[in-house]
């Protein structure tokens, strides 16, 4: 409910049903990106390559989306503000896990189509975060990481959050 008030978007309460994916907020011209990182137990067609690498976030669209899909074009053209909400697992035992607000993303580049692999810069990436859930998301390392895409990110001068945590 709080999110619907912040974005002046009452349909979030009705329209969002604990699923991953894109949710467009017309009133605020904001796209909310909901991502569950751990894909274990999903069919191979749904094992998208989603993870942080330093202050960059790698995201794969759903397989049905192509580079020319309207929502993907809005992301690439920077038409809407993009806010990432992520969680490691959808459920823990019988409880649905909440999404964590990871902040604003900015499109950087993309590769391939169906699914489209998009690289975002995380505008609100916090090297000094004390939020354990957010740190876990930053450090999440899928076993298939980078298998489907190349990782050509300039990391000069960056301090990895993993370098500060023992």
What would you call each of these model-derived segments?
Residues 91-147:
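Compact mixed alphabeta submodule
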Residues 1-98:
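Acidic, glycine-rich low-complexity segments with interspersed aromatic residues
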Residues 143-166:
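Short, charged surface segments at domain edges that flank catalytic/cofactor-binding sites
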Residues 1-7, 106, 125, 158, ...:
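Short intrinsically disordered, low-complexity coil segments enriched in acidic
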């Amino acid at each position: 409910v709080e999110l619907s008030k912040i974005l002046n978007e009452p349909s979030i309460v009705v329209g969002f049903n604990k699923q991953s994916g894109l949710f467009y907020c017309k009133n605020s011209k904001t796209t909310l990106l909901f991502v569950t990182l751990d894909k274990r137990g999903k069919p191979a067609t749904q094992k998208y390559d989603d993870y942080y690498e330093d202050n960059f976030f790698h995201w794969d669209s759903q397989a049905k989306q192509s580079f020319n899909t309207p929502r993907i074009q809005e992301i690439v053209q920077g038409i809407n503000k993009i806010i990432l909400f992520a969680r490691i697992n959808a459920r823990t035992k019988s409880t649905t896990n909440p999404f964590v607000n990871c902040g604003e993303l900015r499109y950087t580049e993309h590769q391939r189509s169906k699914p489209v692999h998009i690289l975002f810069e995380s505008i609100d990436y916090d090297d000094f975060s004390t939020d354990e859930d957010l740190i876990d998301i930053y450090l999440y390392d899928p076993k298939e990481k980078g298998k489907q895409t190349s990782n050509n990110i300039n990391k000069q001068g960056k301090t990895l959050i993993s370098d500060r945590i023992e």
